Amino acid sequence: MISSVRNCGTIQRFCTTSISLLQKPVEENIVRISNQVMVKFDPNSHLRSLINAGNLRAARQVFDKMPHGDIVSWTSIIKRYVTANNSDEALILFSAMRVVDHAVSPDTSVLSVVLKACGQSSNIAYGESLHAYAVKTSLLSSVYVGSSLLDMYKRVGKIDKSCRVFSEMPFRNAVTWTAIITGLVHAGRYKEGLTYFSEMSRSEELSDTYTFAIALKACAGLRQVKYGKAIHTHVIVRGFVTTLCVANSLATMYTECGEMQDGLCLFENMSERDVVSWTSLIVAYKRIGQEVKAVETFIKMRNSQVPPNEQTFASMFSACASLSRLVWGEQLHCNVLSLGLNDSLSVSNSMMKMYSTCGNLVSASVLFQGMRCRDIISWSTIIGGYCQAGFGEEGFKYFSWMRQSGTKPTDFALASLLSVSGNMAVIEGGRQVHALALCFGLEQNSTVRSSLINMYSKCGSIKEASMIFGETDRDDIVSLTAMINGYAEHGKSKEAIDLFEKSLKVGFRPDSVTFISVLTACTHSGQLDLGFHYFNMMQETYNMRPAKEHYGCMVDLLCRAGRLSDAEKMINEMSWKKDDVVWTTLLIACKAKGDIERGRRAAERILELDPTCATALVTLANIYSSTGNLEEAANVRKNMKAKGVIKEPGWSSIKIKDCVSAFVSGDRFHPQSEDIYNILELAVSGAEAHRFDCTLKRAFGVNLYS
């Protein structure tokens, strides 16, 4: 310990002496150490030693006191600032070098470093001026300058300029090839990335492990498992298969291409696994809908002492949301806090999505308001969460807040607001969102367009919905389905069916949602035979397995036609797990037809699935009442009271100025409820005075106010 302290003191004295010597002429910089050895002091060596030691402040002091820096000293100090991610200071120093020290001309080394600084700081204007300088001074012929220039354009998202620089480079090496392939793949241009990879393979440059890994990522993006297997063969030949980054990319490629078993086999055979290995498997399970497997994999990962990263938690919160496991999500939230990842934007967004999906909007809102920074995903998530939960007023408030923050809305945020406008039949609010979509150039977005059609249809303006549909592309399946559904809901079944038939003639391939819409049109128009025709078409012509929603349409169609026995038979023969929706459809039909026994059976099936279902109990009581079985009806209502079952009241909404308010019967939660009820009582009492006169007028045709 004592010797270490002495050494530190010696180093400190040496550094102090060195700095003072820099103030003397170079020829006087001779130091006698221990009165025995004579050494000449080299400022650049001392500068590099300070830089290598990570002491940037001392290095800058030494540099500033140097009477005349050369290209080596300038490059050293600029490079250190770039390494420290202080690109702005690096660019200032480079500018000073060119202005103050005319004797020093930039070379390939310093130009490469400064181009990297431009990429880090996204200073594209400065970078382009350096590009021009490199062309003018013929420094662009250097493979290092070319690679740095290529990388700079790639970093700022100008991948086409990167490709142009690459094509003009007289010499290329493995780093250059890998840089252009990486840029293309990260930009989502997987096919071009693989084209460059093929050219590289044909050249004399050999791919390294990272090049193979990025090429496998391109295969995954294109779902090109055949090409991926070919690369896998090359990886085996080169002996890279045990390299962790390559093994991870191989496993990810197979799972993303649907070859889950091959990906799992690679994962099991890995000699070592890191967070990327585990996370890719978790993501793969989540992608194919096996969320429970994803959770089990996460537990194994934690037991393996591998700490999760942001992507791991984002995938896990998504899995919990899909499973509606709020408790699991809350436990993960505790893990995030313990690992200090709560400031991660992607983690916060995924947590907020989980809370919203699981119905805990209070926690989602608290999380949102506590975020240090927010992106458009944050805003879209909180707006969508409130809108999808039926709290349109809160959704619009958050949207207004987002607009005040200057954040540009996404298609998802606009679609959520259009959905809530349609559900609450607030056409003025929907039109304002439509205007915003036009303002931000999102009106041609498929999601926004279909949401506009739905909104106008639900608000009763089928004409405006039809006008928007007339401007859509023919192959927009979502908008077509929305329009068919809009016609069906407006009782325009003929228009809905005609549109569907017309689309089939032009080669349109319907999906399962389209068939739900057209079956709904058949249901509303009572076209039983045509409904069965389409129901069979989706299975025989398009090889689609009917979902429970399709069966629900057919059960409704049979019930409306009075064929309750056939409807019950279809429900019992369903391959899907029976839910309360189809049984409720049958129960309501039994009420209309007075079919007590079948209605009781339907109610029993519903109560097996949900013992506290108010709709089933109320409808069953009404069936008994309408058929004179008052004692049975009373027993059902007593049973409801004993279980604490309360029928959920219906609600209405009203828009006053820019505020939408939703309310139920007897609602007193509005801040101005006392004033509202006072005015209502005045209106009722005023109407009561004219009630008798109005009755006389209706009875005898006498106008008492003439």
Swiss-Prot record:
- Extract the GO molecular function terms from the UniProt entry: RNA binding
In residue terms, where are the PPR repeats?
Answer: 39-69, 70-104, 107-141, 142-172, 173-203, 208-242, 243-273, 274-308, 309-343, 344-374, 375-409, 410-444, 445-475, 476-510, 511-541, 547-577
Pfam family for this entry, one: E_motif
GO BP = RNA modification
* UniProt keyword list: Repeat
Q: Where is this region: Type E(+) motif?
A: 658-688
Q: Point out the signal peptide segment.
A: none
Q: Where is this region: Type E motif?
A: 582-657
Q: Which family does it belong to?
A: Belongs to the PPR family. PCMP-E subfamily.
- Write down what this protein is called: Putative pentatricopeptide repeat-containing protein At3g47840
What is the originating organism of this protein?
A: Arabidopsis thaliana
